[in-house]
């Protein structure tokens, strides 16, 4: 019995010693923690490197991440969400009472231009109607001005814009076709057909032609430049008829300068119309 107790005591003492020496001490724990902070790494050249995985490195990484994300976060914060448009009577709105006088004025000007265009269409319908209107002083520039007024005072593109452009181009082509003889050698006026047309006019129409001719004669006799004549919208066709009535084409050599001036004026007038 004593032997058994003695053996059991030795066994217990031996077991306690084994457990005591196998347990890690505080110093060994601290040492292992320090060693664990040094992680072995290998770079691309095969060189063994040690990287400290401590709190300082973690703090540096956090700061770098914060600096990288901060500009994006600030940009998101500065981005303005588009506000929903609120309908209001702005300065350019039709509901603004300040714009009503201007709109009424535009409507009146458009109506007046439309009436004038309608009268011209009625007046220039027929075989000799365009010639009569031209003898009374109708010019491509006056028709161009009327066309531009309709386009300008219309709130949107006119529904008959293509028709207005077509009639205008047709008139311009017919008008300047009367000057082909002016550039021949020797130049001819070909004005006889217009004189016959005037003789067949009604008395009131002949009065209108005479008044238009007198106006052109007064302006031309003042010796204005070509630019000034264009600004006054002197009819090239009436200018041609005026030169013919003065006998310029009967003696071309003596009136060469007057003919050249008329040619230059017709060319400049045509360029101005086509601008």
Curated annotation (Swiss-Prot):
Short sequence motif RxLR-dEER: positions: 48-63
Record's keyword annotation contains Signal: yes
Keywords for this protein: Glycoprotein, Host cell membrane, Host membrane, Membrane, Secreted, Signal, Virulence
CC annotations in GO: extracellular region; host cell plasma membrane; membrane
Glycosylation sites: 45
Signal peptide (residue range): 1-27
Protein localization: Secreted; Host cell membrane
Assigned protein family: Belongs to the RxLR effector family.
Description of its domains: The RxLR-dEER motif acts to carry the protein into the host cell cytoplasm through binding to cell surface phosphatidylinositol-3-phosphate.
Record function comment: Secreted effector that completely suppresses the host cell death induced by cell death-inducing proteins.
Protein name from the UniProt record: Secreted RxLR effector protein 153
Species for this entry: Plasmopara viticola
Phylogenetic classification of the source organism: Eukaryota, Sar, Stramenopiles, Oomycota, Peronosporales
Gene: RXLR153
């Amino acid at each position: 019995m004593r032997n058994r107790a003695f053996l059991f005591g030795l066994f217990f003492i031996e077991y306690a010693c084994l457990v005591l020496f196998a347990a890690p001490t505080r110093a060994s724990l601290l040492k292992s923690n320090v060693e664990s902070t040094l992680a072995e790494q290998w770079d691309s050249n095969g060189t063994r490197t040690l990287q400290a995985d401590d709190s300082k490195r973690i703090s540096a990484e956090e700061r770098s991440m914060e600096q990288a994300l901060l500009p994006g976060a600030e940009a998101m914060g500065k981005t303005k969400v588009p506000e929903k448009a609120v309908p209001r009577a702005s300065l350019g709105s039709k509901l603004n009472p300040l714009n009503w006088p201007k709109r009424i004025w535009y409507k009146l000007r458009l109506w007046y231009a439309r009436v004038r265009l309608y009268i011209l269409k009625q007046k220039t319908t027929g075989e000799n109607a365009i010639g009569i209107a031209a003898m009374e002083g109708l010019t491509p520039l006056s028709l161009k001005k009327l066309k531009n007024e309709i386009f300008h005072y219309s709130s949107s593109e006119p529904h008959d814009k293509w028709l207005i452009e077509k009639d205008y181009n047709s008139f311009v082509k017919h008008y300047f076709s009367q000057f082909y003889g002016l550039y021949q050698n020797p130049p001819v006026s070909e004005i006889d057909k217009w004189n016959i047309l005037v003789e067949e006019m009604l008395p009131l129409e002949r009065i209108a032609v005479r008044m238009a001719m007198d106006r052109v004669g007064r302006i031309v006799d003042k010796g204005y430049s070509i630019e000034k004549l264009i600004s006054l919208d002197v009819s090239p066709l009436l200018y041609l008829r005026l030169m013919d009535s003065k006998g310029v084409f009967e003696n071309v050599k003596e009136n060469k300068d007057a003919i050249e001036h008329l040619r230059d004026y017709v060319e400049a007038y045509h360029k101005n119309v086509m601008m």
